């Protein structure tokens, strides 16, 4: 049941026999899947099903916490990220992440976006300015903040802060962008802007998102994975998952007959 290999034109991430443990708790069980390049893939399922755990495995963010470990393979363009000798900061630069709650750094709007660029690249001031403008434009925020770049990121609204975090994430030009319930703390208007942005971002990045909002998954994603109790139950094109799922358990969840 946890092997969901669908035919893709171009695979960006390949997950093979992935297991994850929180101490003695077996949170992910033999996950196998392929994530399509330049598409949006959504993970859905009830709370505690493992969707955020799976997402956070992709850039090894779990290593920041004790007694958590993953086994198996998560391959980015063929390289297993779980065993790669690459510096972990470079892995997280390639596989960026935006969290559920907007987390602007305690610094100016400009410095929030420039922060990662300064860590990984040596750019002239002019090139840095261009990159900051580019990232804010990509995040559909430039026109709203271009005259107040020196103001604190905390001065922005919640929706603007989340777009600032997305700008910060894409400023270092990752290959994959992970979004962990990016709209759950936002109002409907801000949510609509983020959803529109997600649809644009896939032209440049491979986007993987976790959402509790099934309508959001249906609107934004190209592929959807349904998870339950640490298992990958069904994974297919989003239209197929929502219109004609293969499994009864998937249909029950989609139609609200299970929590």
UniProtKB/Swiss-Prot annotation:
Pfam families named among the record's database cross-references: ABC_tran
GO biological process per UniProt: phosphate ion transmembrane transport
This protein's name: Phosphate import ATP-binding protein PstB
Disulfide bonds: none
Family according to the record: Belongs to the ABC transporter superfamily. Phosphate importer (TC 3.A.1.7) family.
Annotated organism of origin: Pasteurella multocida (strain Pm70)
Highest rank taxon of the organism: Bacteria
Membrane topology of the entry: Peripheral membrane protein
SUPFAM superfamilies, sorted: P-loop containing nucleoside triphosphate hydrolases
